[in-house]
């Protein structure tokens, strides 16, 4: 009987000692994300040290902006969504280059902006849905855009693609399937896909640039779940 009581006491004692260790597990918010390009959890993430090569700034001379609203994760209440890219403040018709070599997936050089009433109609739909539908985002709000597949050449962990949006024009003859080299001019910055584009004026020109990482678990965007105080510095490390 005494041995049984000692056994039960021992189990309870050890269990009581072990239990507090679970509270020491770090939450996603507590993990130091310095140098991470995105962080989903302790298995799905990408650190700058895991890149095989660095990228070029897509709008040469225009650095990663300081203003947090121009970086990933910023709210986009006008379309019931959030920002998944970096807005480089390049002026109208400024040359835009491929940040890395790859194969063109999309090049919609003949895309034309809808009129402002139709534009607002799509924004109203987004509001009613409570998010930005993929079709409205990709085929209306990105405007003229080029998408480049980089395969696993940027990192072995994820397939990577870059997206260059709101272009005023796309390099003549550039079509899906073309191979582009790092630094090739793929178009000129503009405001297509924006309200200014719908109004057919020259205001608000910039390059909206996105970088996505794909694997079997899903798609993740540059800056995803990175705190705002680390975001700019982490993204800057991506470029030469």
Task: For the regions a language model picked out, list residue spans one by one.
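Histidine-centered active-site/metal-ligand motif
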Residues: 83, 150, 166, 206-208
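Sec-dependent signal peptide recognition
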Residues: 3-11
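Surface-exposed, glycine-biased beta-strand/turn segments
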Residues: 20-144, 151-154, 182, 235-240
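Short histidine-centered loop motifs in beta-beta connectors
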Residues: 91, 97-98, 150, 156-183
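A residue-level detector for short acidic-glycine micro-motifs
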Residues: 106, 166-169, 191
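Acidic, glycine-rich catalytic/binding loops that coordinate metals and/or anionic ligands
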Residues: 21-27, 32, 40, 157, ...
């Amino acid at each position: 009987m005494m041995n049984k009581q000692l056994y039960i006491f021992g189990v309870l004692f050890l269990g009581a000692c072990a239990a507090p260790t679970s509270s020491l597990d770090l939450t996603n918010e507590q993990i130091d994300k310095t140098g991470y390009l995105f962080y989903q959890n302790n298995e799905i993430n990408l650190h700058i040290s895991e890149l095989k090569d660095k990228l070029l700034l897509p709008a040469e001379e225009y650095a990663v902006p300081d203003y947090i609203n121009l970086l990933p994760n910023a709210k986009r209440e006008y379309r019931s969504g959030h920002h998944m890219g970096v807005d480089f403040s390049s002026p109208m018709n400024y040359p835009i280059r491929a940040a890395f070599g790859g194969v063109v997936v999309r090049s919609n050089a003949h895309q034309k902006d809808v009129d402002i009433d139709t534009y607002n109609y799509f924004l109203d739909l987004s509001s009613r849905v409570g998010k930005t539908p993929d079709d409205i985002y990709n085929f209306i709000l990105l405007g003229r855009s080029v998408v480049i597949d980089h395969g696993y050449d940027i990192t072995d962990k994820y397939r990577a693609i870059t997206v260059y949006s709101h272009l005023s024009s796309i390099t003549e003859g550039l079509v899906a399937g073309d191979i582009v080299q790092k630094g090739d001019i793929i178009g000129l910055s503009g405001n297509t896909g924006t309200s200014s584009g719908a109004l057919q004026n020259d205001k608000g020109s910039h390059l909206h640039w996105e970088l996505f990482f794909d694997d079997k678990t899903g798609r993740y965007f540059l800056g995803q779940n990175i705190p705002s105080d680390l975001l700019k510095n982490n993204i800057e490390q991506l470029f030469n």
